[in-house]
Amino acid sequence: MADDGVNPKAFPLADTNLSQKLMDLVQQAMNYKQLKKGANEATKTLNRGISEIIVMAADAEPLEILLHLPLLCEDKNVPYVFVRSKAALGRACGVTRPVIAASITQNEGSQLKSQIQKIKEDVEKLLI
């Protein structure tokens, strides 16, 4: 298990640069009330069809507790990406606890639309 002990099932894993952009976007989404925190809420947004992108933590223990999300994302055609740290994701979500999954939701007339679109394209490049 090379690569700092990150589970190989955590694919696609964002690099440092993309991780930073994702964390910034998550923070802004929180400010605009376009963020759902946690695996269960992320699942709900996918089922309701209101999710733009799913961000998951690669260091979730055990990782299997959120591996249903990539399958659901593929069914719903929603991009998803892993970041290295659940603690960093928690901080970006504005909570003191670690967060293993977050969903950025759709909002008509949102100021984040262009940023979300750009990040989606970057994430989709990882899958190629």
UniProtKB/Swiss-Prot annotation:
Swiss-Prot/TrEMBL keywords: mRNA processing, mRNA splicing, Nucleus, Ribonucleoprotein, RNA-binding, Spliceosome
Alphabetized PROSITE patterns for the sequence: RIBOSOMAL_L7AE (PS01082)
Domain of life: Eukaryota
CC annotations in GO: box C/D methylation guide snoRNP complex; nucleolus; precatalytic spliceosome; small-subunit processome; U4/U6 x U5 tri-snRNP complex
Cellular compartment(s): Nucleus, Nucleolus
A GO biological process held by the record: maturation of SSU-rRNA
Keyword presence, Membrane: no
Gene Ontology MF term list: RNA binding
Function summary: Binds to the 5'-stem-loop of U4 snRNA and may play a role in the late stage of spliceosome assembly. The protein undergoes a conformational change upon RNA-binding.
Name of the protein this chain belongs to: Small nuclear ribonucleoprotein associated homolog 13
